[in-house]
Amino acid sequence: MTIDFDKLQQAINYQFNDLKLARHALTHRSANKFNNERLEFLGDSLLGFLVAEFLFEHFPEASEGELSRLRASMVSKSALVEIALDLNLSEFLLLGDGELKSGGRERESILADSVEAIIAAIYFDGGLTACKQLIISWS
């Protein structure tokens, strides 16, 4: 399967300098050993950090507990799935045949993981500021 990179970039509101990073972020382990799992790992941490920073700056009166609860809800699997659905990321996922046949495009864990992987790909492509701007635009 090929990815319509123009459509992807329009959907996520980001223009990649290196389209290989975008392809890597959307490649599930069922499709290739060169997959998005490591990007997902980094993207999870980037997302947590950037959301924490955003909340810290925008809610100066909030307690640590309140900030933690807000962050948890904003980086939850359900929140990431909602972002993936809003961006129609399932259309761009590269999945193996077995995963496709078993409904992988709708699997919440795959959708949430793809959002985290895209965040890391954007970090490598455009830096932390690009990630921050994108995450804010998605919220």
Cite the ranges covered by each PLM segment.
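RNase III-family endoribonuclease catalytic core
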Residues: 1-139
